[in-house]
A protein has these predicted regions:
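Conserved beta-strand positions in repeat-built beta-propeller and related beta-rich domains
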Residues: 92-96, 129, 146-150, 191-196, ...
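Blade/loop signatures of beta-propeller domains
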Residues: 33-66, 259-267
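Blade-level signature of beta-propeller repeat domains, shared across WD40, Kelch, NHL, RCC1
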Residues: 391-430
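Secretory targeting signatures
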Residues: 1-39, 520, 538
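Short loop/turn segments that connect beta-strands within beta-propeller blades
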Residues: 104-108, 158-162, 203-207, 250-254, ...
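Beta-rich, blade/repeat-based domains predominating
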Residues: 75-86, 119-140, 172-186, 217-230, ...
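Beta-strand-rich domains and repeat architectures in extracellular enzymes and scaffolds
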Residues: 48, 71-99
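Long beta-sheet-rich domains in secretory-pathway and surface-associated proteins
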Residues: 427-538
Length: 538
């Protein structure tokens, strides 16, 4: 692992960049505001063969008891970043049109705002433009900010004026750049540069920006970030080989010292403001980061089904696992998939809970760290072109790449189904679960039995769902079959008010000593409800 030298200096560039003068897309020899240009009609940019994969396979939005989808009026917009205003209005970026759009949950009406700079650029280039816009946030001055990786730009859309302005994201000539997630923090706009290996903090005032770029400690990816109650920024810095660190950056102290150093014309050194912690086993691509209840740091790993907590006091990581994806998500028409994974992508804190999008499970998970209960809501639309679905009718994923939390509602985008949707977590659940123990200690080769009790909330379940099987759910953080789980039955009916199931939990004779999490519960087509128990092998 190559580590940056300790003598790195923060490049605090007080550039006073005017938003109105920002360059949207650099096109040599032509102005992006040239009104004499012939408008280039690019369409959606996909061939007939490509269109089902990227634009959607379902003409209508779908719904469940907990999830409602809404079809975007313009075809093939490929929605990605999403946020909400305090009044509940939903905003999202369209990666295949260059526009942003809003959705009014009360009227269920979409409004899409044409980006004239994008249209002009397509006309000049005579080609379709497309960009992954990963980050979006609302600022209290009535604007929507979002990132644009294709043009290395940050956009600001004025809600009152309905106008787009942009600035160029600071880049180095010899390093690629990918502005990704974006957070408004007071008068600052914070953006991580995923491939450029830095955080950039823009200070916004009176239509101008100054910025400071904070280099990462390692030459590698700089992913998502979160701010704790003491104004520390936590973010991950990692390499594709799975090595990396969790970084704690003293944001408050840096801001204070930055003002002093600017006046004294001196530099600031990275090592004076950071602490870092080596990744635990199993963490390979930690994209999403959040500060949860009790100020613990939560991280999701996109190469697996794992998510982790980090206690800043004890400096210890704890590994958790989502449910195993259902076969509807991955298909397995070829028969080659032996260990399907859910790929949790981003994670956010909301009240007592944490919310994560499970990309390849086509679910949104809501985890309560206090009770260690995980509720996973199934997204009803599926696109078979992203999974092993040949010959399978209902199969695939909608590529839910982003979500935004507004009270009890979780809004999300479906990148390949041209939908936005909402999970209503206020709706009562169809059943509850209880496990007779929360902790188990096993010797190697030992087996014990725990009792899983499922209580049906029959008033919340339709007659059809009562007849459909409910399945026992289980997964574990252990590897190499160190722990095996065997329920006495695999499915049951919610017709019974209470169903009691014995579950064998066994430690292999060759298991390594250690502490693991085991997830037990039940699931239907629409929802999974589970709880963790802690298993220690001695």
């Amino acid at each position: 692992m190559k580590t940056r030298k300790k003598g790195i200096i923060f490049f605090a560039l007080v550039a006073g960049i005017m938003l109105a003068s920002g360059i949207t897309i650099a096109i040599p020899g032509k102005s992006s505001e040239d009104n004499d240009l012939e408008v280039f009609v690019a369409g959606d940019g996909y061939t007939d063969d490509e269109r089902p994969q990227f634009c959607g396979t379902n003409d209508k939005a779908k719904s469940t008891d907990f999830v409602t989808e809404f079809k975007i009026p313009t075809a093939c917009t490929q929605p990605l970043a999403i946020t909400t205003e305090p009044n509940g209005t939903v905003w999202f970026a369209q990666t295949n049109t260059g526009n942003i759009a809003k959705f009014d949950p009360l009227t269920e009406k979409f409004t899409e705002y044409t980006n004239p700079r994008w249209v002009a650029a397509e006309s000049q280039l005579k080609q379709k433009l497309r960009s992954m816009m990963w980050g979006m946030d609302y600022s209290p001055d009535g604007a929507i900010w979002y990132t644009d990786e294709a043009t290395d730009s940050i956009w600001r859309f004025s809600i009152a004026d309905e106008t787009y302005n942009t600035i160029n994201f600071p880049i180095s000539e010899d390093i690629s750049s990918l502005p990704q997630k974006l957070v408004i923090d007071g008068s600052n706009v914070i953006v991580n540069d995923f491939t450029g290996g830095k955080l950039t903090i823009f200070s916004y005032s009176q239509d101008s920006l100054s910025y400071a770029s904070i280099p990462s400690a390692l030459d590698g990816f700089t992913s998502d970030f979160a701010i704790d109650s003491e104004n520390n920024i936590w973010y991950t810095n990692w390499n594709s080989d799975g090595t990396g660190i969790l970084i704690k950056f003293n944001y408050k102290e840096w801001e204070s010292q930055l003002s002093i150093s600017s006046q004294a014309d001196s530099g600031l050194f990275l090592q004076d403001f950071i602490q870092f912690f080596q990744f635990p086993s199993g963490m390979a691509a930690p994209n999403g980061v959040s500060v949860g209840p009790n100020q613990n740091i939560w991280i999701v790993d996109t190469t697996s089904s794992y998510f982790f907590s980090f206690d800043p006091v004890t400096e210890e990581f704890t590994k958790y696992v989502t449910s195993v994806p259902t076969i509807d998500s991955y298909g397995n028409a070829s028969g080659f998939i032996k260990s399907p994974i859910s790929r949790p992508y981003w994670i956010e804190h909301s009240g007592d809970n944490l919310v994560m999008n499970e990309q390849t499970a086509n679910r949104i998970g809501v985890f309560n760290p206090s009770t260690e209960t995980l509720v996973e809501y199934t997204i009803p639309s599926r696109n078979p072109n992203w999974s092993d679905c040949e010959g399978i009718e209902y199969c695939g994923v909608a590529q839910v790449f982003d979500f935004a939390i507004d009270g009890k509602k979780i809004w999300f985008t479906e990148w390949v189904e041209n939908n936005i949707g909402v999970v209503d977590t206020s709706i009562p659940l169809p059943f509850s679960i209880d496990i007779d123990t929360k902790e188990i200690t096993l010797e190697k080769g030992e087996t014990t039995v725990v009792t899983l009790q499922v209580t049906s909330n029959r008033s919340m379940v339709s007659a059809l769902e009562l007849l459909l099987p409910t399945n026992v759910n289980y997964s574990t953080t252990s590897t190499f079959s160190d722990i095996t789980i065997k329920p006495e039955l695999n499915d049951f009916s919610l017709l019974s008010e209470v169903t009691t199931i014995s579950v064998e939990v066994a430690a292999s004779e060759h298991a390594l000593s250690g502490t693991h999490k085991v997830l037990l519960g039940a699931y239907t087509n629409d929802i999974a409800i589970s709880q963790f128990i802690t298993v220690t092998i001695v």
